[in-house]
């Protein structure tokens, strides 16, 4: 096992910069996930680590060794590709043994290692089959097993679950986590799936357009995203972004005013007429219930009495069993935006219904509309 360190890694293809000044260090034994939309550079980073790409500039270390000029076969890393890259003419056992044979390991030890790995992945009954005789999930396990059999210092997995159906993907994701906990091998995992990123990672590296947006533990990034891009990418359903203007101590959203809490005014110090973007997750929007000053809980809560509802029009109702996802429209000055709201399954709504909601301002995010940078909290 080994740590992995990237120092200002840049990769250019003629006039195109795929990744720029990428720097981070993965401690020995940790599971890091590179996440971002297609074309953000995550696969280029992985291919650079494994040695399939050469950095235009910067330094790459595996353990204490600078590996810029070390060929892939000598880096002692193992990669699992999206399409598994199994040899179709070989049996499962031969696929598992391939990397060991290429390193001239003793045949007896190869057989022992293959059997051990196959048992650990519950594929020992498949050793004599060819890849075409396997399901997608079984092929994925064989690809993992081939990497494990080599006992590498670093695992690299490039979207290994993307070809699996939803249920199998969930099951295999849990198995991957258990496998890492058992083996403790430094792992770099590439995905565009934010659920995989949140559930698997010790640390997440958020990327866009070849640059790092944020690095951190999944829950800390979810709770305090550095910018709008990260905020809307992590979370399912995605965070709502509402264009607003600060005026008269309130947020003007379309033609509706939402009173701005004093705590936000004090920290944000907004200017009169300043354009802002309000971010709120669907689970932090509540159906508005009018309250009166006689309510015991509100007698000393002045702010609660000032809460102003937001009126929406229901467009789509998506029952999810344990709850319902509502997609509603919010009229703006020049167009309209879609707002997603999670409501209890007991709430019955239809397309065209009016829906009055209130935002949980304790869970509100505010972004700069020009740069996307987080301004609050």
Give names to the regions the model predicted:
Residues 58-66:
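Conserved ABC transporter NBD signature motif
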Residues 56-59, 109, 209, 364:
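Conserved coupling/switch loops of ABC nucleotide-binding domains, chiefly the family-specific signature
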Residues 72-229, 233:
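ABC ATPase nucleotide-binding domains
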Residues 5, 25, 61, 356-358:
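ABC ATPase nucleotide-binding domain
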Residues 250-377:
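Non-catalytic connector elements of ABC transporters
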Residues 50:
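Helix-to-loop junction immediately C-terminal to a conserved catalytic motif
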Residues 35-37:
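The feature captures the beta-strand-to-loop junction immediately N-terminal to the Walker
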């Amino acid at each position: 096992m080994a740590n992995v360190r990237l120092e200002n890694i840049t990769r250019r293809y003629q006039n195109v910069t795929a990744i720029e000044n990428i720097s981070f260090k993965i401690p020995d034994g940790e599971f890091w996930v590179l996440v971002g939309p297609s074309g953000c550079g995550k696969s280029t980073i992985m291919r650079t680590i494994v040695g399939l790409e050469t950095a235009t500039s910067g330094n790459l270390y595996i353990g204490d060794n600078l590996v810029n000029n070390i060929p892939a076969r000598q880096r002692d890393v193992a990669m699992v590709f999206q399409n598994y890259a199994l040899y179709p003419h070989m049996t499962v056992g031969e696929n598992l043994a391939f990397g060991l044979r290429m390193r001239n390991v003793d045949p007896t030890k190869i057989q022992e290692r293959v059997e051990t790995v196959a048992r650990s992945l519950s594929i020992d009954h498949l050793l004599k089959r060819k890849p075409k005789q396997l399901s997608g999930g079984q092929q994925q396990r064989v690809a993992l097993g081939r990497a494990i059999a080599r006992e590498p210092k670093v695992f690299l997995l490039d979207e290994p679950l993307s070809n699996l159906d939803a249920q199998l993907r969930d099951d295999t994701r849990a198995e991957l986590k258990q496998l890492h906990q058992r083996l403790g091998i430094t792992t770099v995992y590439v995905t565009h799936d934010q659920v995989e990123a949140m559930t698997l990672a010790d640390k997440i590296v958020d990327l866009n357009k070849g640059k790092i947006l944020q690095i951190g533990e999944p829950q800390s990034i979810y709770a305090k995203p550095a910018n709008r891009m990260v905020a809307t990418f992590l979370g399912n359903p995605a965070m709502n972004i509402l264009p607003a203007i600060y005026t008269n101590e309130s947020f003007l959203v379309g033609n509706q005013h939402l009173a701005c809490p004093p705590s936000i005014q004090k920290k944000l110090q907004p200017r009169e007429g300043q354009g802002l973007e309000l971010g709120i997750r669907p689970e932090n929007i509540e159906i508005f219930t009018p309250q009166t000053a006689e309510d015991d809980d509100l007698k000393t809560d002045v702010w609660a009495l000032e809460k102003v509802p937001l009126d929406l029009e229901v467009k789509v109702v998506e029952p999810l069993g344990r709850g319902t996802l509502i997609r509603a429209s919010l009229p703006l000055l020049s167009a309209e935006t879609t707002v997603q709201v999670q409501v209890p399954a007991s709430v019955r709504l239809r397309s065209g219904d009016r829906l009055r909601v209130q935002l949980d301002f304790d869970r509100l995010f505010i972004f700069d509309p020009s740069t996307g940078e987080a301004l609050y909290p």
